[in-house]
Amino acid sequence: MKENLIYSINGPVVKVKDTDAFSMLEMVYVGNSKLMGEVISITKEFTTIQVYETTTGLKPGEPVFPTGQPISVTLGPGILRNIYDGIERPLEEIAKESGAFIPTGSAVEPLDTKKLWDVTLTVKVGDHVEGATVYAKIPETDMIEHRCMVMPGMSGTVTEVKENGQYTINDVVMVFTDDEGVAHECTLTQKWPIKTPRPVNKRLPISMPLVTGQRVIDTLFPIAKGGTAAIPGGFGTGKTMTQHQLAKWCDADIIVYVGCGERGNEMTQVLEEFRELVDPKSGKPLVDRTVLIANTSNMPVAAREASIYTGVTLAEYYRDMGYHVAIMADSTSRWAEALREISGRLEEMPAEEGFPAYLPSRLSQFYERAGYMENLNNTNGSVTIIGAVSPQGSDFSEPVTQNTKRFVRTFWALDKALAYARHYFAINWNLSYSEYIPDLERWYSKNVDPKFMRDRQELASILAEETKLMEIVQLMGSDVLPDDQKLVIEVARVVRVGYLQQNAFHKDDTYVPLEKQLKMMEVILYLNNRCQQVVAQGKPIRTIIETGIFDEVVKMKYDVPNNDLSKFDYYYKKIDAICASID
């Protein structure tokens, strides 16, 4: 047998002087340590391989072993509550074997092969099965039922089914025979290539919001289930904290959190916090619905790309079971930097700011895997992608931010000035937008209140008017404004501080139901209307400010508990009483 030997090594890029043995995007094992790699280029003379582990100690002349398979992930029960690296190696298992750092060539099974699962079979002999047909159900965690499915693209008639009971992931629990008479054994797991989207029947129109309990998002810039969002912001503006908050409280069934090139301490924080926090709907620990993929900044650069695709493949697998999945990618800029580094080592022609010319197509391949889908088994599920972008120096005109804007429909722009003024979330309402609002109007009208979107529009117009007036105030001071415009600035302050700003550490303010958000909006708009009537009668705005009513309305987010909205009546009476006393 002809050996395929390493010819050259340049960081994570390895060249082999042979082109017959390999195919494009094939997974290979490089060197005597069997480092995982992927074929990314084949020319007449050389095969180029991108290695997903550190190549320190690798020498020319060492063998490269082809596998004939693309890079794939193992899908089955046990994914949830786990923490993986970018190529689906379980970090907790590796830590038990070899400590805090991953040894090169470490090959640990992604899922526990010895654990027994309680399996309930849902098919019987003689049943016809096809791609994504559920043949077994397993309680994976207290919150999530795992549904084992036939591989897409396969079909046949069931010839053998095991009894309900306890099985490991590699036990055969069902056998079916296809139309050509070939028997296929089904265990509790399957493998799927990470760069191939899992097939669906069709995309469905987007119609439901991903409810996050964060007022600035749910009210002003909502994201839909199956939607895409970007969170761009400079250093220290709160991208990671925003994603942590969304991962904790959004109403997705499953969270996939991908830490791509960010600090390791942030992944540790997610692990520790999610074990302590309780899901408000089920009362179970949040970690029961979460899978973490940690590819921190000190891990091999090439694996950042794999971590993004691994995360979205796991998300699609749970979507096929009929779940709504949200994937947090923090941060896509680090992935783009990895593309730039490898592109430079391959001596490709750079495009804008040194990024490769194929950056937009790679970003689109990732974001287009989001969607609200009808699955092959006729269930409905969704994948929602929320990607953080880290533009250097908060420059939103750089290529990653600009190309991301082309593929996402919600844009939450984080503002350094707001962040340093301790305004959390630091989402700038002038730069941010959501294109899902027309799609979600019917849902808000039916499930919350027909007035919700109208009130939202009024709130947005108050903020827009304040922005215009602040230009005059900064030039000439607020004293030159007439009272009706001073009122706009005062009410806008109530909106900013009392509504948009949120306290992640307060028990009633960290997560706010939509009903409470609506009531808060209505109180602020009622205050605005009553004060307009008082000012229109010629009474000075100063007399209203001195009553302290604006500050009292700001504090209602803390004073009204989420489970007792009747206390909002007090604010209507107080506003009426104060306005009547001024009259």
Residue ranges and their predicted role:
Residues 219-220, 226-548:
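P-loop NTPase catalytic core
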